[in-house]
């Protein structure tokens, strides 16, 4: 979408006057439309636009190498990376984008930027029963992001017809969360 159409999606919301945050997620990979995403976030944060703080905007990505680097250099908005599995071979099964720029490369790129002040780094992680919910996965996450100032958003998977994946129960989700929180 062009920047104007992106902004129109925001302006068209009935609750536009009540918005507190915007997340670029779920409508395709934002880095594949980077020029327009940057232009839209520029207008949202500029004095001549909405004059929002970049802290109110998050852009989610699977991690498209050169474009993620450019985004991090040209924007102060928060960034959320879709991880979903810390083990590259398994992540490639869930997310073909792993083959383009692996999660290990994404994390190495992120280490070059400061996320301790205004900008926040988050990782999105849909927890699938028997796929990415083991302590092996939790330990691999901790090892992968060690030293990074980041947050994890654990997302419960809701069953989709004809999709063989399942979500975890509350106990498993809490165990996984607690392990990440304690380490």
Put a short name on every predicted segment:
Residues 1:
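Local cysteine-cluster metal-coordination motifs and their immediate loop/turn environment
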Residues 183:
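Conserved dinucleotide-binding and phosphotransfer motif residues
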Residues 5-180:
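Conserved AdoMet/S-adenosylmethionine-binding subsite of the radical SAM
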């Amino acid at each position: 979408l062009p920047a104007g159409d992106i902004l129109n999606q925001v302006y068209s919301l009935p609750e536009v006057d009540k918005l507190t945050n915007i997340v670029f997620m779920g409508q395709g990979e934002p880095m594949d439309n980077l020029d327009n995403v940057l232009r839209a976030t520029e207008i949202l944060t500029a004095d001549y636009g909405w004059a929002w703080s970049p802290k109110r905007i998050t852009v989610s990505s699977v991690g498209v190498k050169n474009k993620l680097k450019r985004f991090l250099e040209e924007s102060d908005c928060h960034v959320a990376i879709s991880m979903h599995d810390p083990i590259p071979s398994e992540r490639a099964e869930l997310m073909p984008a792993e083959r383009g720029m692996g999660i290990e490369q994404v994390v190495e790129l992120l280490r070059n930027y400061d996320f301790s002040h205004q900008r926040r780094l988050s990782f999105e992680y849909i927890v699938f029963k028997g796929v990415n919910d083991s302590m092996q996965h939790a330990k691999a996450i901790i090892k992968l992001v060690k030293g990074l100032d980041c947050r994890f958003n654990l997302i419960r998977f809701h069953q989709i017809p004809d999709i063989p994946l399942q979500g975890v129960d509350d106990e498993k989700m809490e165990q996984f969360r607690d392990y990440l929180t304690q380490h």
